[in-house]
């Protein structure tokens, strides 16, 4: 039987928590730090883990060392996941920025992902508005606004009608 959590050192409790968090899905380092520093729900309500900054650094280092935490892998999987859900490059970049991923890492991963964003934009437009895509101005504006909200770039959106006209 395991010993009560109050008797376990803060480092051990943090490490256990980090592994449980990372077992569910990949996280960026910043996300993991935020989740580790948040209070834990205990039997008597939220409980703080009385860990030092050194404990947090040791846990993060352990996760990197044992390949539980890898920002590059996280970025590639995040881009693949969000693009499968129909989101464009601008929105994905913004979400990665919010998750603490550097602009350089994001741009490198976006170049390596080999996704045809204009084709994805067309698929999203067809899924929402049907085939053939609207050709009158007011309907085109609706499609454009929808795709911009989903995070597609204006060049990719305009490419839809250029290819459609050909």
UniProtKB/Swiss-Prot annotation:
GO biological process: regulation of DNA repair
Family: Belongs to the RecX family.
Organism in which the protein naturally occurs: Salmonella paratyphi B (strain ATCC BAA-1250 / SPB7)
Name of this chain's protein: Regulatory protein RecX
Keywords of this entry: Cytoplasm
GO cellular component labels: cytoplasm
Pfam families: RecX_HTH1, RecX_HTH2, RecX_HTH3
InterPro entries hit by this protein: RecX_HTH_1st (IPR053926), RecX_HTH_2nd (IPR053924), RecX_HTH_3rd (IPR053925), Regulatory_RecX (IPR003783), WH-like_DNA-bd_sf (IPR036388)
Main location: cytoplasm
Lineage: Bacteria, Pseudomonadati, Pseudomonadota, Gammaproteobacteria, Enterobacterales
HAMAP family assigned to the protein according to its UniProt record, in alphabetical order: RecX
Keyword DNA repair tagged: no
